[in-house]
Amino acid sequence: MKFKADEISSIIKERIENFDLNLEIEETGKIISVADGVAKVYGLKNIMAGEMVEFENGDKGMALNLEESSVGIVILGKGEGLKEGASVKRLKKLLKVPVGEALIGRVVNALGEPIDAKGVINANEYRFVEEKAKGIMARKSVHEPLHTGIKAIDALVPIGRGQRELIIGDRQTGKTTVAVDTIISQRGQGVICIYVAIGQKQSTVAQVVKRLEEHGAMEYTIVVNAGASDPAALQYLAPYTGVTMGEFFRDNAKHALIVYDDLSKHAVAYREMSLILRRPPGREAYPGDVFYLHSRLLERASKLNDELGAGSLTALPIIETQAGDVSAYIPTNVISITDGQIFLETDLFNSGIRPAINVGLSVSRVGGAAQIKATKQVSGTLRLDLAQYRELQAFAQFASDLDEASRKQLERGQRMVELLKQPPYSPLSVEKQVVLIFAGTKGFLDDIAVSRIKEFEDGIYPFIEAKHPDIFEQIRSKKALDSDLEEKLAKAINEFKANHL
């Protein structure tokens, strides 16, 4: 078979025209040194700050330090097998994590990967971990309550949806318990909860997850865990991953609550990373931008305006203090960023007052607007009464004889302190709180021994539910106490006292 010359040339031309050259240019660099979860890389000239890279062993990394001749990259993994001379590839993208309904009920790591052995998460959407906080015009002032189910908080330091309320105290004062109680209390309220564990022991996180499962709270909760054994880079990323997941629900006109447990360990992880990256240390060896580290995180919690769907993201950051010192660097930073703080005290905890909330130092700067009218009515003077009681209590230690009015005030104060005690993992509905605080502030408990206050509390709820169910129903629907309802309530309390105490 003979080919004509022009046929051959036309075939060659056709092949050349249809030749599809798929050339992908990859920019790679070489590791100069690697230690403590940080790699120094030479050769990535065009890399961006915060850009993702891939190492030879498959681990991902994030570029944080851009220097003249090298790039400081934190390794988002174990970093096993990485050595000098290994190649590093630019991925030309920023870090994204999965968001959406598929994550609810799951335990994930700081990159959004499942670590609960329940299979793959099929997320429909991924979002950038570093997002800019919403501006002023996109927001609305906090006006809806977020009930924690804890009497002392809902009455004295109320939290609103979209608020940032700090929980601060020494170790072993019940900070995590307050946060977990708040999550349990959101059952049936349509609030998606995110619990971010930073630098915690795995056993502690497992305990929290177990507690949430026992109370059916994992049905609406996502747990993000960067444990004590995880690299500092993952501990640094975990809160940003959590808030990104929370923002998805907020932006879709839903309500979300996020707990950061705790930001002291987060700051320590960031300090560790910064020092290894040779960034200049400042006060307490923290880098200069440690304030920005937390402010950009906490500013992402907000209440959106009606045009954007009126969704909200409430943040409960936790800070651990040393010997009650709230004037240390990180505590003062976070106090100045948040809209109030709940201060837990070791002395109160040890004396059996639990939750160990110091009413004098705890404050909610915006939550008052979110409190329902009924709670406002019954707890209006409670903070002042408790403050006067504490003052009088200190004075009574030295004075042997007190006048009648002071003695009555002391006795009322003792009953109110007893009334605000609450066992862990047993949040109370608002209507029950209103009934109980009404009984205390209106003097119905003055003739009951302090040791029997718990008995009164345990009995009054089932009694009203059985004999006067309309009281709870009216508080729920009206969200306020009118004179008729107050009369009914007083009558029911007196009836219970006469028959059961």
UniProtKB/Swiss-Prot annotation:
Localization per record: Cell inner membrane
Coiled-coil region(s): none
Entry GO MF terms: ADP binding; ATP binding; proton-transporting ATP synthase activity, rotational mechanism
Chief place where the protein resides: membrane
Gene3D superfamilies named in the record: 2.40.30.20, ATP synthase alpha/beta chain, C-terminal domain (1.20.150.20), P-loop containing nucleotide triphosphate hydrolases (3.40.50.300)
InterPro entries: ATP_synth_asu-like_sf, ATP_synth_asu_C, ATP_synth_asu_C_sf, ATP_synth_F1_a_nt-bd_dom, ATP_synth_F1_asu, ATPase_a/bsu_AS, ATPase_F1/V1/A1_a/bsu_N, ATPase_F1/V1/A1_a/bsu_N_sf
GO CC term (a single one): proton-transporting ATP synthase complex
Keywords attached to this entry: ATP synthesis, ATP-binding, Cell inner membrane, Cell membrane, CF(1), Hydrogen ion transport, Ion transport, Membrane, Nucleotide-binding, Translocase, Transport
CDD domains membership: ATP-synt_F1_alpha_C, ATP-synt_F1_alpha_N, F1-ATPase_alpha_CD
UniProt catalytic activity: ATP + H2O + 4 H(+)(in) = ADP + phosphate + 5 H(+)(out)
Membrane-related topology note: Peripheral membrane protein
Residues of the site described as Required for activity: S362
Enzyme class: translocase
Pfam families in alphabetical order: ATP-synt_ab, ATP-synt_ab_C, ATP-synt_ab_N
Superkingdom of source: Bacteria
Known EC number: 7.1.2.2
Positions with a binding annotation for ATP: G169, D170, R171, Q172, T173, G174, K175, T176
Role noted for this protein: Produces ATP from ADP in the presence of a proton gradient across the membrane. The alpha chain is a regulatory subunit.
Family per record: Belongs to the ATPase alpha/beta chains family.
Quaternary state and interactors: F-type ATPases have 2 components, CF(1) - the catalytic core - and CF(0) - the membrane proton channel. CF(1) has five subunits: alpha(3), beta(3), gamma(1), delta(1), epsilon(1). CF(0) has three main subunits: a(1), b(2) and c(9-12). The alpha and beta chains form an alternating ring which encloses part of the gamma chain. CF(1) is attached to CF(0) by a central stalk formed by the gamma and epsilon chains, while a peripheral stalk is formed by the delta and b chains.
Protein name, per record: ATP synthase subunit alpha
Species in which this protein is naturally found: Campylobacter jejuni subsp. jejuni serotype O:2 (strain ATCC 700819 / NCTC 11168)
Organism lineage string: Bacteria, Pseudomonadati, Campylobacterota, Epsilonproteobacteria, Campylobacterales
UniProt gene name: atpA
